[in-house]
């Protein structure tokens, strides 16, 4: 045990409208934050006075105060400083405008704002979504959070898109409560891997979430907050326009990039509000290896938990008890296609996969589909397993699963994403 007195402690006195920013990069480093007095929040979640909050390697934190406070840091962050220049007041004003629209929707029994946050990579899109969601639930709203970022999404594991009804603020050092999320398997960490399939899933998720909004009066007036990926040029821009249409978006917040802001002003309907917001100076650019590590960490947390450890199950599944598929096959030239079939149909085709050593370490999504007669690619998933061993002699896969056997369904979808289980 480390002697608590040996841990360095630093007090920071923050004036109103300023924030304490710190980062932890060193392996196995922990930093504890304690609000000694005043009021402060982390991305819209209020801190409780004298309660310790623990952050670990990889954390990039900005604690903001509207009225002033004193914060104690225990531990050795790689960098820690107080910033007086912050866009938080602008973000609060944007949220006030959304709240005005929600009040109006509530009075008229109409649909609340459908909000989309866009911008290139590493400008703070996920953070802004979190701030909007936390502020909304603190005011008694129940918005739906939609995450279309297949590389660094916050609802399920990478390689998926999903939606979640948010009923309480996110805990300070964690994400939103993951009760009953609606998740669709995509199977890649970038939309460019299969653009056609990505658009199909966006349309399906939009259709389902808009129906759910209508079915829940509280959610209906609260609306949606949609997070997007950082691909904003070429096909990436086309995906943004497709999302606007599919979700019937009413407001777009563009972070940091004026070119994207002006393109959207030109291309979306006049009824859609397009608003430019600056990124925070605390936003940190991530390297390719940091992104890969973040994806691994998301998958690890899915099986093993973060603060509260989870204990996944390992068991064998017979080849004969499951059907494994992937979505999409290489496109054929038009001259080779059957009559009436288009080249893009290949991108959304269900292709059978024979169990074998090539599946080792791959993530498999467990589809809710009961047979291939259903539209499997547009059916949401129950959860995920990881293949930890393939025994061709016994014709079994050994899998890591969050719940004990048997698998809830037998149709499994292969993801490009892999996870090396080191436990």
Curated annotation (Swiss-Prot):
The keyword Nucleotide-binding applies. Signal peptide: none annotated. GO terms for molecular function: ATP binding; polynucleotide 5'-hydroxyl-kinase activity. CDD domains: SIMIBI. It is found in: Nucleus. The keyword RNA-binding does not apply. Belongs to the Clp1 family. Clp1 subfamily. Required for endonucleolytic cleavage during polyadenylation-dependent pre-mRNA 3'-end formation. This is Protein CLP1 homolog. The lineage of its organism: Eukaryota, Metazoa, Ecdysozoa, Arthropoda, Hexapoda.
